[in-house]
């Protein structure tokens, strides 16, 4: 456990607290997948360091991935132009993303900020994963239910 806050939203957890939050958030996320806060907490409390480290290393070994890790761009209402995306031709990723956000009446900013990751190098990996998760749903044509979310996780 990190005894001190490593970043603004960081909530350091003792090992027992992490386990209990993981179990509780998983139970809540399964019974009510609309609880994005619990889905996020489950993902963070069950994310094991070696998995995040493997993703980080893979990103670092790729030219574009390395650039992402250096620049740390975010996907938010501030960085995307939703009106422009909505005007894109049908069949484009941007148009699919716009339709996805509209259909769910949501926005990129609705995703919770990472709180329970105790490693600064893994912080961006988890945040980026969370912000790009919708693209996986779109590419795999998966619904935003438990089965669709699980399928997207495996992908």
Curated annotation (Swiss-Prot):
GO BP annotations, alphabetical order: ubiquinone biosynthetic process
Keyword entries, A-Z: Ubiquinone biosynthesis
Pfam families listed in its UniProt record: Coq4
Domain of life, per lineage: Eukaryota
Entry annotated with the keyword Glycosyltransferase: no
GO cellular component labels: mitochondrion
Assigned protein family: Belongs to the COQ4 family.
Name of this chain's protein: Protein coq-4.2
Organism, scientific name: Caenorhabditis briggsae
């Amino acid at each position: 456990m990190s005894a001190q806050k490593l970043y603004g939203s960081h909530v350091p957890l003792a090992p027992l607290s992490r386990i209990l939050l993981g179990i509780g958030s998983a139970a809540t996320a399964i019974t009510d997948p609309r609880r994005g806060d619990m889905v996020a907490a489950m993902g963070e409390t069950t994310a094991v360091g070696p998995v995040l480290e493997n993703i980080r290393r893979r990103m670092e070994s790729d030219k574009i991935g390395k650039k992402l890790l250096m620049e740390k761009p975010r996907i938010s209402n501030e960085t995307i132009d939703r009106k422009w995306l909505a005007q894109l031709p049908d069949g484009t990723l941007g148009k699919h993303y716009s339709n996805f956000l509209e259909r769910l009446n949501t926005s990129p900013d609705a995703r919770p900020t990472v709180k329970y990751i105790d490693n600064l190098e893994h912080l961006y990996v988890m945040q980026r994963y969370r912000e790009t998760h919708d693209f996986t749903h779109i590419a795999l044509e998966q619904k935003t239910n438990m089965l669709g979310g699980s399928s997207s996780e495996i992908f």
